């Protein structure tokens, strides 16, 4: 680990879900050009990772190149920093306790009583410093999940307090993201929740150097002075984080408010954020948000419709495409359980994303059929590919009982498994981290839509699945107009399908939304929207 390692710690207060991940990524972006920045997310839940958590409860599961299933905030880290994160950077209390219990069984504590302090905090510290060492990091951005005062994150808070004592206060800075409400009918900002949140943090031995106020409007001078007085910070160290048309405005806003200068002064470093390229792209997004040159309406037909964060990366992919094509994309999440054709008539394109289980199958299949028959641009992702195959088998090839082995809701034995379990998955009982996960090569067939979009015959994409297209049916599909345009590197598994006769009917087994960048939008989303214009 470098002797001059710098650490920024981001905590949250008042309520959860106010954007710590975006805030952390935005601050990290200001330092990315001058420092080797490594983002770390600390989550207090006892799951080893979020891979088995319902997206409606915790947001989408983000899959990394190394196969790790991590918190959705890593999507923000990767997109803002243009890097490929590692699963070890997501520290969960489940991982920490598992390691401690394993060490205890191995006798590594030499008969001592294993306690929360020092053993748990020491293990967290060790993990953090190991990451810094292995990545040769100049700077760590440590986001502590949840809200200050939660029982789940107390030990993470204590750990970063101890780290300050070990590396010196000049090498670490604490940033607190809080919420300043303006209750309806009062029309006045309230600082008391922020004061209480900071006092809770103070009781744990942490005194923030920077307070970032999440609110609907810029803080009034009165509120700013009040927060400064009762939270022991300079008024210049209280930063506005107001509602914006796109999250990519936030690094620019922080830059204009001098966040990088405040933190650089505290840490005794110099930085040049180089914000120009991002500013140009954000300018395009903002101009189309207020006065759109063209509007494209996209339906996202998914089963996790209760929470927008379930499909966060898909929405971001569309934002990236919009910035490059100079237009506005309006995406609407439609519950696949309530789908009917009348719901889809107003849309220029349709996306059927991934998911698990049989719930909502038939609604998605109906949407796919509607897109195919009406030549509406369509993109299927993961399960979306599998259901596109089922729809084609049933309605074009005449295999009326075509289905997937995953659908356990059948009342009859499956005779035509056009989608079946991956051979490597047979016999696996555990659910966590047992799928085909991570980055794998895909070989593209020349003279196909996919090949034209990517401009090369070999790509790397990220996967998260247990089921695949049954090769026994591929020739039949091809005879009827659906071809395989992308294969696994051994040519044994179909990874991309398309219908050449349609304007854009493409489906992939991988998740292209996981590698999109605002500087370089995912190619399949780019192709989808171009077909909608």
UniProtKB/Swiss-Prot annotation:
It catalyses: UTP + L-glutamine + ATP + H2O = CTP + L-glutamate + ADP + phosphate + 2 H(+); L-glutamine + H2O = L-glutamate + NH4(+); UTP + NH4(+) + ATP = CTP + ADP + phosphate + 2 H(+). GO terms for molecular function: ATP binding; CTP synthase activity; glutaminase activity; identical protein binding; metal ion binding. Keywords: ATP-binding, Glutamine amidotransferase, Ligase, Magnesium, Metal-binding, Nucleotide-binding, Pyrimidine biosynthesis. Residues 1-269 are annotated as: Amidoligase domain. Allosterically activated by GTP, when glutamine is the substrate; GTP has no effect on the reaction when ammonia is the substrate. The allosteric effector GTP functions by stabilizing the protein conformation that binds the tetrahedral intermediate(s) formed during glutamine hydrolysis. Inhibited by the product CTP, via allosteric rather than competitive inhibition. One of 8 loci used for multilocus sequence typing (MLST) in Borrelia burgdorferi. The active site is at residues 382, 511, 513. The keyword Nucleotidyltransferase does not apply. ATP binds at residues 17-22, 73. SUPFAM superfamilies: Class I glutamine amidotransferase-like, P-loop containing nucleoside triphosphate hydrolases. UTP binds at residues 16, 190-195, 226. One of its GO terms (biological process) is 'de novo' CTP biosynthetic process. Its EC number is 6.3.4.2. Mg(2+) binds at residues 73, 143. It is an enzyme of class 6 (ligase). Pathway: Pyrimidine metabolism; CTP biosynthesis via de novo pathway; CTP from UDP: step 2/2. InterPro entries: Class_I_gatase-like, CTP_synthase, CTP_synthase_N, GATASE, GATase1_CTP_Synthase, P-loop_NTPase. Belongs to the CTP synthase family. PANTHER family: CTP SYNTHASE, CTP SYNTHASE-RELATED. Catalyzes the ATP-dependent amination of UTP to CTP with either L-glutamine or ammonia as the source of nitrogen. Regulates intracellular CTP levels through interactions with the four ribonucleotide triphosphates. NCBIfam families: PRK05380.1 (NF003792), PyrG (TIGR00337). CTPSs have evolved a hybrid strategy for distinguishing between UTP and CTP. The overlapping regions of the product feedback inhibitory and substrate sites recognize a common feature in both compounds, the triphosphate moiety. To differentiate isosteric substrate and product pyrimidine rings, an additional pocket far from the expected kinase/ligase catalytic site, specifically recognizes the cytosine and ribose portions of the product inhibitor. This is CTP synthase. It comes from Borreliella burgdorferi (strain ATCC 35210 / DSM 4680 / CIP 102532 / B31) (Borrelia burgdorferi).
């Amino acid at each position: 680990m470098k002797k001059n390692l710098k650490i920024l710690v981001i905590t949250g207060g008042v309520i959860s879900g106010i954007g710590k991940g975006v805030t952390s990524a935005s601050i990290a972006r200001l330092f990315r050009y001058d420092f080797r920045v490594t983002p770390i997310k600390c989550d207090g839940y006892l799951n080893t990772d979020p891979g088995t958590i319902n997206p409606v409860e915790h947001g989408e599961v983000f899959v990394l190149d190394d196969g790790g299933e991590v918190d959705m905030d890593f999507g923000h880290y990767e997109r803002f920093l243009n890097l490929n994160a590692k699963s070890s950077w997501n520290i969960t209390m489940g991982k920490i306790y598992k390691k401690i219990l394993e060490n205890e069984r191995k006798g590594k504590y030499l008969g001592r009583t294993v306690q929360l302090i020092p053993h748990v905090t020491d293990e967290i510290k060790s993990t953090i410093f190991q990451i810094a060492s292995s990545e040769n990091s100049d700077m760590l951005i440590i986001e502590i999940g949840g809200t200050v005062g939660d029982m789940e994150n107390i030990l993470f808070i204590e750990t970063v307090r101890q780290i300050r004592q070990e590396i010196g206060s000049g090498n670490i800075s604490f940033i607190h993201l809080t919420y300043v409400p303006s209750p309806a009918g009062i029309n006045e900002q309230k600082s008391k929740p922020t004061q209480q949140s900071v006092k809770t943090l103070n009781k744990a031995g942490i005194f923030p150097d920077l307070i970032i106020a999440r609110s609907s409007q810029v803080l009034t001078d009165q509120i700013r002075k009040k927060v400064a007085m009762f939270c022991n910070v300079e008024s210049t160290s209280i930063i506005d984080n107001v509602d914006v048309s796109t999250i990519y405005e936030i690094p620019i806003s922080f830059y204009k408010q001098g966040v990088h200068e405040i933190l650089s002064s505290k840490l005794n470093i110099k930085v040049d954020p180089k914000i120009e390229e991002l500013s140009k792209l954000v300018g395009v997004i903002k101009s189309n948000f207020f006065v759109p040159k063209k509007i494209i309406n996209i339906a996202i037909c998914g089963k996790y419709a209760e929470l927008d964060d379930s499909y966060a990366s898909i929405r971001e992919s569309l934002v990236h495409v919009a910035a490059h094509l100079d237009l506005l994309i309006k995406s609407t999440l439609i519950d696949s359980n309530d789908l009917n054709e009348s719901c889809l008539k107003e849309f220029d394109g349709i996306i059927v994303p991934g998911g698990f289980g049989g719930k909502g199958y038939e609604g998605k299949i109906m949407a796919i059929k509607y897109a195919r028959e009406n030549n509406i641009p369509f993109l299927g992702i993961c399960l979306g590919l599998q259901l596109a195959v089922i729809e084609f088998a049933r309605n074009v090839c005449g295999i009326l009982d075509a289905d997937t082995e995953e659908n356990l809701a059948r009342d009859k034995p499956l005779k035509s498994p056009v989608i079946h379990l991956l051979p490597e998955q047979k016999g696996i009982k555990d659910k966590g981290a047992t799928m085909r996960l991570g980055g794998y090569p895909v070989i593209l067939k020349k003279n196909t839509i996919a090949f034209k979009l990517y401009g090369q015959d070999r790509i790397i994409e990220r996967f998260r699945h247990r089921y695949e297209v049954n090769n026994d049916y591929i020739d039949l599909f091809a005879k009827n107009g659906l071809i395989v345009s992308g294969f696994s590197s051994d040519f044994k598994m179909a990874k991309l399908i398309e219908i050449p006769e349609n304007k854009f009917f493409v489906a992939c087994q991988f998740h292209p939304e996981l590698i999109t960048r605002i500087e370089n939008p995912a190619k399949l989303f780019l192709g989808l929207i171009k077909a909608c214009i």
